[in-house]
């Protein structure tokens, strides 16, 4: 199993043992950290580095493209993987091995599949009976993504050689 490396002067595992404002267990976050690194390293051959997680305070995103997967069963909520458009294009091209038009269904399918792989691998590692929904993809600057109310949304900032992205985890045990 992958163990987080030293990032920004600290260990991601140590940073997650005290999640932002201690409102979400690191046991719910670490599967998404591990899955993100595994999916990007294996599928796109791009290794992300992670910064300290933090709480998201509003529903607006600062990104242009988001892949969203809902959870049901013993875990409720969603995971969102968001990118700037240029970063998303480079990642999709690396994933499929050719240039993909961002206005095509192949582009949205690839973004949805990245979100699906991250959610699916994390679901397995959570060890709970959970279902994941079909991916939804939203494209547009400043889009808004609905969240479970009363449940913290933890943002995991990720940095790669092709640009930055974020994984947002908004889940709770049922």
Could you describe each region identified by the protein language model?
Residues 2-174:
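N-terminal auxiliary interaction/assembly segments of multi-subunit proteins
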């Amino acid at each position: 199993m992958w163990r987080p490396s030293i990032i920004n002067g600290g260990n991601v595992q140590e940073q997650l043992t005290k999640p932002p404002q201690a409102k979400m267990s690191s046991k719910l976050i670490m599967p998404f950290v591990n899955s993100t690194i595994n999916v990007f390293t294996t599928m796109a051959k791009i290794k992300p580095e992670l910064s300290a997680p933090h709480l998201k305070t509003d529903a607006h995103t600062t990104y242009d493209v988001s892949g969203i997967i809902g959870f049901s069963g013993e875990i409720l909520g969603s995971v969102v993987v968001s990118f700037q458009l240029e970063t998303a294009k480079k990642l999709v091209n690396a994933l499929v091995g050719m240039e993909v038009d961002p206005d095509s269904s192949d582009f949205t399918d690839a973004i949805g599949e990245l979100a699906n792989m991250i959610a699916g691998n994390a679901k397995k590692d959570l060890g709970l009976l959970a279902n994941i929904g079909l991916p939804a993809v939203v494209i547009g600057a400043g889009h808004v993504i609905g969240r479970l109310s009363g449940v913290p949304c933890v943002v995991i900032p990720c940095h790669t050689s092709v640009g930055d992205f974020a994984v947002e985890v908004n889940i709770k045990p049922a």
